């Protein structure tokens, strides 16, 4: 039985108005008594939190509103002791525009990070955005970059270029990092968009 937990809403142990990892850990025995064998928690990564944490600015850091890295480690260990596994969200379709990768990409067209994202000199694309009531296009002009960048979701969530070997290596590093800390698996966010984007239509390239 998989029990999904919205990290920000589940249990606020420290009383700051936001649910936290320590709060989930405090309720582990209760969750186990309900019969859960797997806990799936929503994003807890460093984030501006403009999209409920799905706008990640660092995949290897815990956002302070949710706790610290040690809290995650302790939570995973406690869950394992109770016979439960932990799966987390793997967010690799896009990042926050506050992510250091994007900030470096937009500042310098020669930066190796430029290829981490999808850029264009025009916005001539009739692909509808995921949220047409909020976004008019999947392309947004960036003054500093001097180009448009693609975002299937919100303009503050630029799409990663999954055809880039460097991006795939970054994703591999993220996966390895969390597996070493004891997570048992991942829920792949926006999976349908990953296959459409990777290789930009070339099945021999990308994810």
Residue ranges, per PLM feature:
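Active-site and adjacent substrate-binding regions of carbohydrate-active enzymes
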Residues: 1-207
